[in-house]
Amino acid sequence: MQDVPYADLAAEHRAPPQRNTLGKASVYAIFICWTLFAVFVYSRYSQLGDARAYMSGGYDDEASARTYMVTQIATTLIGLLRVDVLAHLAFSMFAATGVAYMVGQARVHGHYRWPLLALLLTPSFGVWASVVGRESLYIGCLGFFMGAMVGYFRARGMHRLLFAMVALAGMVFIRAPFGGAMALFFVMAWMLMRGPRVGLSLGVQMMVLLALGALAIVIAWPQLDDYIAGEVLPKARSYFTIYSDSTRMWINIQTSRELFTSLWWTLPLAVVGPTPGEVFARPVLFPFFVSGLVVFFLLLYAIQQAFRAPKGLPRKILVLGWLPAMLVTLISYVPFGVYNAGSGIRYASCFLLFLVFPWMLRSALAATAEQPAALRRPRDFHQYRLAELR
């Protein structure tokens, strides 16, 4: 029987094998494949209307500033590259770079990579993340933001904090409601990581957060109600209440109360997207129906992972920071995702990457705990690693 040195055994179990890591090249390859699929396959069955309008300058100068910016970027790329698919690839590579940066900062490895891969391989995310449009720009900014926040938790550094703020500004500019939810997460995560230690349990802090949130809603309710009923809901109806195989003419949400009281069924409907009946009427939606189911169960699994994170700061960041931001994101998405399944898929692609943040944070924790002691910051990462292994 051959003796195996204990040091070799320890080294083998300390660092994950290279084949178990998610490489940045794989991320870029996935986005390139989605771009080619969207341009040469998907566009034959469903229009890439917004992407074509951006590249052709279809939106006039009277459009919003963010639409004008995307139009200028797209038309400039078309003028330089002369080929539509190359312009799509340019937007796709920006989104891929953001995701690759997040993967690098989180040191994604082992079982932590599977939820991210499941998301990257779903059509509801991949198609719109890989073509010209606001979605690919937002996803790139979100990837940079998530990577900077994970990196700041792992190694601190003012440059990461500033980078996160720049990416956050980009998200607020491109998609204000979703960007506002990310701003909430940024503030909560920063307070938990850098603020004073209050010595309260997670349950007590959750109750305090709920009380403060309820108080803020009560104080701001008149303005919030006017904004939702006077701007958000009419805009959503005007966007999508046109005849289409994927337009739900039977839905009509007119007041803030109707929006919040119907969340028990409108939220799952908006997240999943096409229903079986809509898929039967329009078979091209079948891959997106499957993707919607994957996203829905991934959301439930992510919530479970947040509460199962190692005790202390990691769990507080996820429960007190990520979970409220995710809730605000989903509620703000419902008016734009429930009326039209096809358009809702495009809107949802912006924030789907945020679903995998619990695994990114836990992957960074596990990878940091496995580093040699001389390379680690003086924090009790071994305690977190033991919690991950339980």
Give the location of each predicted region.
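Alpha-helical transmembrane segments and terminal signal-anchor/GPI-anchor hydrophobic tails
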Residues: 44-45, 49, 55, 175-310
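Short hydrophobic/aromatic helix or loop-helix immediately within or flanking a transmembrane segment
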Residues: 52-84, 266-270
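Loop-to-helix entry region of an early transmembrane alpha helix in multi-pass inner-membrane enzymes
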Residues: 68, 80-97, 288-293
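Transmembrane-helix motifs of polytopic, lipid-linked glycan transferases
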Residues: 89-109, 297-301
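Transmembrane-helix signature of polytopic, membrane-embedded enzymes
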Residues: 102-123
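Membrane-interface transmembrane helices that cradle and orient dolichyl/undecaprenyl
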Residues: 106-110, 145-160
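Membrane-interface alpha helices of multi-pass inner-membrane proteins
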Residues: 126-128, 160-183, 187
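Short acidic/glycine- and proline-prone juxtamembrane loop motifs at membrane-interface regions
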Residues: 130-138
